[in-house]
A protein has these predicted regions:
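Conserved beta-strand elements of beta-rich interaction domains across eukaryotes
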Residues: 52-55, 90-93, 120-124, 132-134, ...
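Eukaryotic endomembrane system proteins
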Residues: 154, 162-163
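Boundary/activation segment at the start of structured domains
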Residues: 1-115
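A short, glycine/acidic-enriched catalytic loop
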Residues: 119-152, 169-174
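Short coil/turn segments at secondary-structure boundaries
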Residues: 59-65, 90, 100-101, 128-132, ...
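Eukaryotic basic, amphipathic alpha-helical target segments in cytosolic regions
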Residues: 81-85, 104-111, 124, 147-151, ...
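Structural motif
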Residues: 48, 115-119, 157-159
Length: 175
């Protein structure tokens, strides 16, 4: 065998000490050493799209125009990515929590990932059901590794399209 800079033979590695790489305690067990996820399960995953457009009068919130177009585009995009897509419209805060609890208890063993898209009004750290606010932590906590074991080590994406308060966001300029 030619001895080049990029080649290794068994003699050169016999006396090497094994190198142990410790992950952080918060790291899901399915992440490989190169920080990538295993995405070869039989199904790509489940995508839940919650589209809140119309709000109860008691909230004082206006209807969200354009949100149906966003929801349709997201549905098409995730279907093209081979996700099972479920659209839910105008859910109360209680219905959002119940839906997330139920979805977290589903059989995800054959799925590579999970996506939740929330289209609604919001503020910093919260999203609005049609009748009031829900803490985002309450929603995402259902999918923690200790509560939703079948998604441990798999990507869980939460996409939130909502205002985060009343302060002006100057945005960023791109090329």
């Amino acid at each position: 065998m030619e001895n080049t800079e990029n080649s290794v033979d068994s003699k050169s590695i016999k006396n090497l000490e094994p190198k142990i790489i410790h992950g952080s305690e918060s790291m899901d067990s399915g992440i490989s050493l190169d920080n990538s996820y295993k995405m070869d399960y039989p199904e790509m995953g489940l995508c839940i799209i919650i589209n809140n457009k119309n709000f109860h009068k008691s909230t004082g919130m206006t209807s969200r125009s354009g949100t149906d177009v966003d929801a349709a585009n997201l549905r098409e995009t995730f279907r093209n990515l081979k996700y099972e897509v479920r659209n839910k419209n105008d859910l109360t805060r209680e219905e959002i929590v119940e839906l997330m609890r139920d979805v977290s208890k589903e059989d995800h063993s054959k799925r590579s990932s999970f996506v939740c898209v929330l289209l609604s009004h919001g503020e910093e750290g919260i999203i609005f059901g049609t009748n009031g606010p829900v803490d985002l932590k309450k929603i995402t906590n259902f999918f923690r590794g200790d509560r939703c074991r079948e998604l441990t080590g798999k990507p869980k994406l939460f996409i939130i399209q909502a205002c985060r308060g009343t302060e002006l966001d100057c945005g960023i300029e791109t090329d």
